[in-house]
C-alpha cells in the first residue's frame, strides 16, 4: 500500500506540473525518489532539462562547479535530442508529447485504479524513451572520431548561451573568449532558433524580448548555418575591395589608405611654400632654401641598405621622386634618431618633407642630396597608387624592373620606343609592293652598291626596312612596258564580261535556250501573257535578234573613242542644218509672186533683204551656238506684250507694183521720201474697244474695293490665329519635343567616337612621351686604347684585345636649325652638322616633332633665298 500511495502522489505531482508549467521541473525533482533514497532513472532527464532552461535564460557562469560526468551527460542528452529531431521528426514529436502529457488532467474524483493504470502507461513510455536514449549514446560515442576528421561537414554548434550572448554583446574580449577551443561547452550542441535570411532583425528582437522562452519551443527550430567568423570576415573583405581613392591636392598624387585629412593638410601648409621635387635643383641654384619655409612631397622609389659610418653610426638613404620625371631622383639621407624612427617606412610610401637641408653630392655627380635633422619633419601620408613597374618583358623573358607612373603609361621609355619602332617597321613593310628579303636576280645590276648588298640580308635602319628598300630598287630597275590605256584597262571587269571574252576568243557558239515541257504548256494557254510573249518572240526573230551572233565588243583607246564621238556630233549637226535648209526652201517656194504684167515689167528698185536669203553651207557645217532672235527676219517687229495687235497683212503682188509706181512718180516730181528710224519704238495703235474694256475694269475695281476688304478680313483673322498658335506654348512644346532614344543615340555615338579615337589617343600619348624624353640611360663601352665611347665595341678592339670596360651612359638628343638631328653620349656633340656645317645644336626629344603645313607668311621670302656667301653684303 505504501508503494501505491507513492505512485499516486507522483501522478498528482505530474498533473500539477502540467497546470503550472513554470514550476514543473523543481517539483519533479522533489517527488521522483525511491524508497531507499537513491535518485530515480528519470531524475537525470528532468535535471538536464532544468539545467538547459536556466542555461538558456541566464548568462552567468554559476554552473562551473558541476562535475565533468554531469557535463558529458548533459551534452549527450542534448546531442541525442538534436539527432532525434533531425533524423526522426515523428518519434521526436511523440517523445515531446509524452513528456508534456497530452492527456487531459484528471480530476480528483477518479478512483485509485484509474490513477494506477495511467501511472503504468507513463512508466512504460518513459522506459521506451530511456532505451532510445541509450541507443543514441552508443552511436554518439563512436562518432567523435568521425566528427574530428570532417569538421566542415558536421561541425559542433556553439551552445545556446554563447549564441545568445554573441547576439546581444559585441565586445571583442568576449568574442575572443568564445573562440577558445579548450572550453568543454563547445562540444555541446545547442538548439538555436531558425535564422530566416530575409528578416534577421525579427529573430534577434524575438530572442531579446523573450529571454525566458522554454527550451522545447527552441528545439523545434533549425539552427542557422552562419558563424561569427564568417560574419566578421565578410565586411572586412568587402571593405578592402571598396577602398576610397584619394588625390592629394598639394602633391597631386593618388593615395591608397591616406593617413592625413585634407583639412589638416591645409592647416599644415598655411604660410609655407610648395616646391616640386623635380624643381629643387633649379631652386637651389637661384634661391637660398635655408631662408624659406618650404615643403616638398615625394614617393620612396628605393631604399638603400643601411650603411655604417667610420664612427659606427648607421644611416639610410631614400631615393625620392614625384613620378613626373622618373630619370631624376633625389636622395634623402637619414642619420641618427631620424634613421631609428623612420627606417621601417616601406617602399612606395608618399612622404612630405619640411625644410630639408641640402647636401653636397659626390664628385662628378649632379644628383640632389637632402637630409633632415628631426623625424617630425617627415610626414607619412599614405601609399602611392600610381607607382608600379613596367609590364613589358626583357629579351631574356624576365619581367622589366623599371619604375613607371601607372597614371601616365604602364610601360617604360625603352619599351615604348621599341614598340614605336616595331609599328613603324610594320607600316613600311605594308607600304612596299615586294615583301621578299632579297632583290630578285633578274633585277640585280652589275655594279651593286654596298647599301644594296646589305639590304639583301634584311635589316631595319633609319625608319626604312630592307624589304621596302629592295622593292624601291626593283621598281626603279624594272623596265617599264608601255601599255595603251583603254577603257577596259581603267574599269574593273566583271565575271560575265570575262567569261564572254574568253568564249569569243575560243570561238564557242552561244548556247540556244531549250524550252521545257511545262513552259510549252504555259505558252499554249490562251492568256494575255503568253500572247504578248509570242508576239515579242516573233518580232525578235523577224528583226534577226534571236539566234544571230552579237557583234564582238572591241576595246579601243580613249583618243579613238573621243574621235568617234566628235565625228558623230559633226554628222548630227550636218543633218540638222540640212533639215533646216529644206524647211526654209519649202516655206519660200509657197510665197512665190505671180507673173507681173508686161506693162509693169520693171527691175526692182531695192535688192532683196538679206534676212530672206538662207546661208548656204559651203563645206563646214552650221554651228549650233546660241543666238538672240533666231528665226526673226530683218525689219520684223518684236513685241513682248500679249495684247499686241496682229501683224499687218502683206501686200499682194499687184498692190506692191502699184506702190512702186507711186514712189517713182513722187521721185520724178522731186519729192524726197524720209526713211523711218529703225530704232524708234513703234507705238501700238489704240483700239477703241480696248479703251472701253479698261474703263469697265476700273469701274468694277472701285465698286468692289469695299467688298474686297470685307472678304479679306476673315483671311487676316485666320492668319493672326495661326501666328498666335505658332507662338503658343503648346506649339513650342511640340517643336522642342525630342525622341526618348536620344540618350541611347548619344551614348552610341560617344562609344563609336571613343572606339575611333582611343588608338589615336594612345599613339599621340606615346609620341608626346617620346618627344618629352630628352635623354635615355644606356649601356656604353669605352676603349681606353682607341679613346672612344660608343654603344658597341669595334671588332678590331676585340681582336687586338684592347683595354675597354662597359659602364652606364646617357644618350642625349640634339637638333640643328636646318632640321638635321644627332645623338651624343657627351654634353654636346663633338662635330659640326653634316648638312649645313654649322655648330648650333639644341636639345631635342627622342622623337622628331611633327610639323604641319606652313602658311604663306612662313614660306614667303621677299628678298629671295639668302645664301651664305652673300650674307651681310649690304653692310
Curated annotation (Swiss-Prot):
Basic and acidic residues: compositionally biased ranges: 106-120, 151-167, 568-582
Keyword DNA-binding in annotation: yes
N-terminal domain, as annotated region: 1-156
GO biological process, one term: DNA damage response
Sites bearing Phosphothreonine, chain numbering: 85
Positions of the UniProt region annotated as OB-fold domain: 238-389
GO CC annotation terms, alphabetical: nuclear replication fork; nucleolus; nucleoplasm; nucleus
SMART domains found in the cross-reference section: Mcm10
Subcellular location: Nucleus
Sections of the chain in a coiled coil: 104-142
Location, primary (coarse class): nucleus
Keywords from the UniProt entry: Coiled coil, Disease variant, DNA damage, DNA replication, DNA-binding, Isopeptide bond, Metal-binding, Nucleus, Phosphoprotein, Ubl conjugation, Zinc, Zinc-finger
Biased composition (Low complexity): 587-603
Covalent cross-link (Glycyl lysine isopeptide (Lys-Gly) (interchain with G-Cter in SUMO2)), residues: 493, 627, 762-763
Residue stretches of biased makeup (Polar residues): 206-224
Similarity-based family: Belongs to the MCM10 family.
UniProt disease annotation: Immunodeficiency 80 with or without congenital cardiomyopathy: An autosomal recessive immunologic disorder with variable manifestations including decreased B and T cells, reduced effector and memory T cells, NK cell deficiency, chronic cytomegalovirus infection. Restrictive cardiomyopathy and hypoplasia of the spleen and thymus have also been reported in some patients.
Record's comment describing the protein's domains: Each zinc finger-like domain binds a zinc ion and is involved in both ssDNA and dsDNA binding, as is the OB-fold domain. The N-terminal domain mediates homodimerization.
Job of this protein: Acts as a replication initiation factor that brings together the MCM2-7 helicase and the DNA polymerase alpha/primase complex in order to initiate DNA replication. Additionally, plays a role in preventing DNA damage during replication. Key effector of the RBBP6 and ZBTB38-mediated regulation of DNA-replication and common fragile sites stability; acts as a direct target of transcriptional repression by ZBTB38.
Subunit text: Self-associates. Interacts with ORC2. May interact with MCM2 and MCM6. Interacts with the DNA polymerase alpha subunit POLA1. Interacts with RECQL4; this interaction regulates RECQL4 unwinding activity. Interacts with WDHD1.
Protein name: Protein MCM10 homolog
Source organism of the structure: Homo sapiens
Amino acid at each position: 500500500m505504501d508503494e501505491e500511495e507513492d505512485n499516486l502522489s507522483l501522478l498528482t505531482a505530474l498533473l500539477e506540473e502540467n497546470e503550472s508549467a513554470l514550476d514543473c521541473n523543481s517539483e519533479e525533482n522533489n517527488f521522483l525518489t525511491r524508497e531507499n533514497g537513491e535518485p530515480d532513472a528519470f531524475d537525470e532527464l528532468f535535471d538536464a532539462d532544468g539545467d538547459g532552461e536556466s542555461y538558456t535564460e541566464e548568462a552567468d557562469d554559476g554552473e562551473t562547479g558541476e562535475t565533468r560526468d554531469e557535463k558529458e551527460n548533459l551534452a549527450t542528452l542534448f546531442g541525442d535530442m538534436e539527432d532525434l529531431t533531425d533524423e526522426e521528426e515523428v518519434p521526436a514529436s511523440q517523445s515531446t508529447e509524452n513528456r508534456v502529457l497530452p492527456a487531459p488532467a484528471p480530476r480528483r474524483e477518479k478512483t485509485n485504479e484509474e490513477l494506477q493504470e495511467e501511472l503504468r502507461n507513463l512508466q512504460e513510455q518513459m522506459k521506451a524513451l530511456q532505451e532510445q536514449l541509450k541507443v543514441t549514446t552508443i552511436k554518439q560515442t563512436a562518432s567523435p572520431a568521425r566528427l574530428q576528421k570532417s569538421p566542415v561537414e558536421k561541425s559542433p554548434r556553439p551552445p545556446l548561451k554563447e549564441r545568445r550572448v554573441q547576439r546581444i554583446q559585441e565586445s571583442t574580449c568576449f568574442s575572443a573568449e568564445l573562440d577558445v577551443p579548450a572550453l568543454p561547452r563547445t562540444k555541446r550542441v545547442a538548439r538555436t532558433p531558425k535564422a530566416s535570411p530575409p528578416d534577421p532583425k525579427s529573430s534577434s528582437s524575438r530572442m531579446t524580448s523573450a529571454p525566458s522562452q522554454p527550451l522545447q519551443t527552441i528545439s523545434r527550430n533549425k539552427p542557422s548555418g552562419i558563424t561569427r567568423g564568417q560574419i566578421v570576415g565578410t565586411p572586412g573583405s568587402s571593405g578592402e575591395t571598396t577602398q576610397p581613392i584619394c588625390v592629394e591636392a598639394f602633391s597631386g598624387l593618388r593615395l591608397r589608405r591616406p593617413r592625413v585629412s585634407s583639412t589638416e593638410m591645409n592647416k599644415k601648409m598655411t604660410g609655407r611654400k610648395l616646391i616640386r621635387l623635380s624643381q629643387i635643383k633649379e631652386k637651389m641654384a637661384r634661391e637660398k632654401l635655408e631662408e624659406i619655409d618650404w615643403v616638398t612631397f615625394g614617393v620612396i622609389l628605393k631604399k638603400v641598405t643601411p650603411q655604417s659610418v667610420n664612427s659606427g653610426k648607421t644611416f639610410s638613404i631614400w631615393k625620392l621622386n614625384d613620378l613626373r620625371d622618373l630619370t631624376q631622383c633625389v636622395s634623402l639621407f637619414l642619420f641618427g634618431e631620424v634613421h631609428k624612427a623612420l627606417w621601417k617606412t616601406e617602399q612606395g610610401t608618399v612622404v612630405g618633407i619640411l625644410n630639408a637641408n641640402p647636401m653636397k653630392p659626390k664628385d662628378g655627380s649632379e644628383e640632389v642630396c637632402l637630409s633632415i635633422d628631426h623625424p617630425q619633419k617627415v610626414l607619412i601620408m599614405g601609399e602611392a597608387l600610381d607607382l608600379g613597374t613596367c609590364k613589358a618583358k626583357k629579351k631574356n623573358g624576365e619581367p622589366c624592373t623599371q619604375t613607371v607612373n601607372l597614371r601616365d603609361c604602364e610601360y617604360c621609355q625603352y619599351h615604348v620606343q621599341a614598340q614605336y619602332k616595331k609599328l613603324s617597321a610594320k607600316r613600311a613593310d605594308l607600304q612596299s609592293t615586294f615583301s621578299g628579303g632579297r632583290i630578285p636576280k633578274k633585277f640585280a645590276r652589275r655594279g651593286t652598291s654596298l647599301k644594296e648588298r646589305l639590304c639583301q640580308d634584311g635589316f631595319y635602319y633609319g625608319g626604312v626596312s630592307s624589304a621596302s628598300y629592295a622593292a624601291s630598287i626593283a621598281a626603279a630597275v624594272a623596265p617599264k612596258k608601255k601599255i595603251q590605256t583603254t577603257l577596259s584597262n581603267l574599269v574593273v571587269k566583271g565575271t560575265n564580261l570575262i567569261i564572254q571574252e574568253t568564249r569569243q576568243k575560243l570561238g564557242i557558239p552561244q548556247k540556244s535556250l531549250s524550252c521545257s515541257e511545262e513552259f510549252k504548256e504555259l505558252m499554249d494557254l490562251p492568256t494575255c501573257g503568253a500572247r504578248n510573249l509570242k508576239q515579242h518572240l516573233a518580232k525578235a526573230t523577224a528583226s534577226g535578234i534571236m539566234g544571230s551572233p552579237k557583234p564582238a565588243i572591241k576595246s579601243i583607246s580613249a583618243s579613238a573613242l573621243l574621235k568617234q564621238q566628235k565625228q558623230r556630233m559633226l554628222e548630227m549637226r550636218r543633218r540638222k542644218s540640212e533639215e533646216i535648209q529644206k524647211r526654209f526652201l519649202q516655206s519660200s517656194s509657197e510665197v512665190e509672186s505671180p507673173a507681173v504684167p508686161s506693162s509693169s515689167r520693171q527691175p526692182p528698185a531695192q535688192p532683196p533683204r538679206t534676212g530672206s536669203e538662207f546661208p548656204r553651207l559651203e563645206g563646214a557645217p552650221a554651228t549650233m551656238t546660241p543666238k538672240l532672235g533666231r528665226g526673226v527676219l530683218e525689219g520684223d517687229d518684236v513685241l513682248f506684250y500679249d495684247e499686241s495687235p496682229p501683224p499687218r497683212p502683206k501686200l499682194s503682188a499687184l498692190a506692191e507694183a502699184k506702190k512702186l509706181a507711186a514712189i517713182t512718180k513722187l521721185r520724178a516730181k522731186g519729192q524726197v521720201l524720209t526713211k523711218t528710224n529703225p530704232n524708234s519704238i513703234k507705238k501700238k495703235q489704240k483700239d477703241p474697244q480696248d479703251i472701253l474694256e479698261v474703263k469697265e475694269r476700273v469701274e468694277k475695281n472701285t465698286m468692289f474695293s469695299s467688298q474686297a476688304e470685307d472678304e479679306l478680313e476673315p483671311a487676316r483673322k485666320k492668319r493672326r490665329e495661326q501666328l498666335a498658335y505658332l507662338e503658343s506654348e503648346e506649339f513650342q512644346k511640340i517643336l522642342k519635343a525630342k525622341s526618348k532614344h536620344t540618350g541611347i543615340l548619344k551614348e552610341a555615338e560617344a562609344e563609336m567616337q571613343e572606339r575611333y579615337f582611343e588608338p589615336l589617343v594612345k599613339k599621340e600619348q606615346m609620341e608626346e612621351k617620346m618627344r618629352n624624353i630628352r635623354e635615355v640611360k644606356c649601356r656604353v663601352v669605352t676603349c681606353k686604347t682607341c679613346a672612344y665611347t660608343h654603344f658597341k665595341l669595334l671588332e678590331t678592339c676585340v681582336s687586338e684585345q684592347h683595354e675597354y670596360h662597359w659602364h652606364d651612359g646617357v644618350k642625349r638628343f640634339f637638333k640643328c636649325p636646318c632640321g638635321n638631328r644627332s645623338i651624343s653620349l657627351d654634353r654636346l656633340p663633338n662635330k659640326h652638322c653634316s648638312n649645313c656645317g654649322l655648330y648650333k645644336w639644341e636639345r631635342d626629344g627622342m622623337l622628331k616633332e611633327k610639323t604641319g603645313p606652313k602658311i604663306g607668311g612662313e614660306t614667303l621670302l621677299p628678298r629671295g633665298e639668302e645664301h651664305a656667301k652673300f650674307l651681310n653684303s649690304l653692310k
